[in-house]
Amino acid sequence: MLGVLLVLHGSKIPEWKDVGIKYAEYLSRYFNLVEFGFLEFNKPTLSEALSNLLAKGANKIVVVPLLFATGTHFKRDIPRLLGIDGDEKKIQYMGKEIEIIIADPLGFDEKIGEVLVKRVNETYNKNY
């Protein structure tokens, strides 16, 4: 069964968790097993979120970093926190081999650009 694991950076500000909750709820319309985890500061951690998916029966997991670009978190931290070693895309869980695929960072996307335009206009109109 496919599991989707959203990865958020995390913050000392508790409201960061609300973003994870909202994106997980949104993706739950399309996928049965969706969890989110944070790289630092907030709970659930990435490892805890992975454990939740595995406990619910996920045997293939697509990891979706909510990051804009490739960097240290993407290249080093996410694989390490998921227990992925090198180019290996599998982990062992209760005697089973679990495939983990990490999606690319968000990068540039015109739909995200449209959201940015909307935010600029909302902010400008609210203040002028």
From Swiss-Prot:
Active site: H9 (proton acceptor)
Sequence positions that bind Co(2+): H9, H73
Amino-acid positions noted as binding substrate in the UniProt annotation, renumbered to this chain: K43, F68, A69, T70, G71, T72, H73
Top EC group: lyase
CDD domains, per the entry: CbiX_SirB_N (cd03416)
Domain of life: Archaea
EC number: 4.99.1.3
UniProt KW keywords: Cobalamin biosynthesis, Cobalt, Lyase, Metal-binding
Pathway: Cofactor biosynthesis; adenosylcobalamin biosynthesis; cob(II)yrinate a,c-diamide from sirohydrochlorin (anaerobic route): step 1/10
A Pfam family that the UniProt record links to this protein: CbiX
GO molecular function: cobalt ion binding; sirohydrochlorin cobaltochelatase activity
GO biological process, one term: anaerobic cobalamin biosynthetic process
Reaction catalysis annotation: Co-sirohydrochlorin + 2 H(+) = sirohydrochlorin + Co(2+)
Family: Belongs to the CbiX family. CbiXS subfamily.
Task performed by this protein: Catalyzes the insertion of Co(2+) into sirohydrochlorin as part of the anaerobic pathway to cobalamin biosynthesis.
Complex formation: Homotetramer; dimer of dimers.
Name of this protein: Sirohydrochlorin cobaltochelatase
Species this protein is from: Saccharolobus islandicus (strain L.S.2.15 / Lassen #1)
